[in-house]
Structure formats: structure tokens, C-alpha cells
Amino acid sequence: HECCKKGFCDPGCDCCDQ
């Protein structure tokens, strides 16, 4: 996900927990 690569988490993205 883009949010993971950019270092932030968009609504609905669980990359913060990955």
C-alpha cells in the first residue's frame, strides 16, 4: 500500500499494524 511506503496510514488501511 502507498500509505505503508510513505510512512503514514490512510483510513481503511491496516498497514500501521503490519
From Swiss-Prot:
The cysteine framework is III (CC-C-C-CC). Keywords: Disulfide bond, Secreted, Toxin. It comes from the Eukaryota. One of its GO terms (molecular function) is toxin activity. Its main location: secreted. It is found in: Secreted. This is Conotoxin pc3a. The keyword NAD does not apply. It comes from Conus pictus (Cone snail). Disulfide bonds join 3-15, 4-13, 9-16. Expressed by the venom duct. Belongs to the conotoxin M superfamily. GO terms for cellular component: extracellular region.
